[in-house]
Amino acid sequence: MTKRVRITLVRSTIGQREPVRRTVRSLGLRKLHSMVEKDGSPAVLGMVRAVSHLVRVEELG
């Protein structure tokens, strides 16, 4: 069973390159301080790693 992670957008995508913006959008994050909960699959964790300078990640039980 994969762990769940809560991802919060804490920095704006203004001034970021287009691939970074698309990655943030594909994670389901739209506005600043928006949060989503996702399964901690390798695909999701790879996307989080690519935008780690913009998001905060918390592991859920």
Curated annotation (Swiss-Prot):
Record has Ribosomal protein as a keyword: yes
Family affiliation: Belongs to the universal ribosomal protein uL30 family.
SUPFAM superfamilies (alphabetical): Ribosomal protein L30p/L7e
PROSITE patterns: RIBOSOMAL_L30
UniProt xrefs under CDD domains: Ribosomal_L30
Subunit structure: Part of the 50S ribosomal subunit.
Protein name per the record: Large ribosomal subunit protein uL30
GO cellular component annotations of the record: cytosolic large ribosomal subunit
Organism, scientific name: Treponema pallidum subsp. pallidum (strain SS14)
InterPro entries, per database record: Ribo_uL30_ferredoxin-like_sf (IPR036919), Ribosomal_uL30_bac-type (IPR005996), Ribosomal_uL30_CS (IPR018038), Ribosomal_uL30_ferredoxin-like (IPR016082)
Alphabetically ordered keywords of this record: Ribonucleoprotein, Ribosomal protein
One BP term from GO: translation
Presence of keyword Ribosomal protein: yes
One term of GO molecular function: structural constituent of ribosome
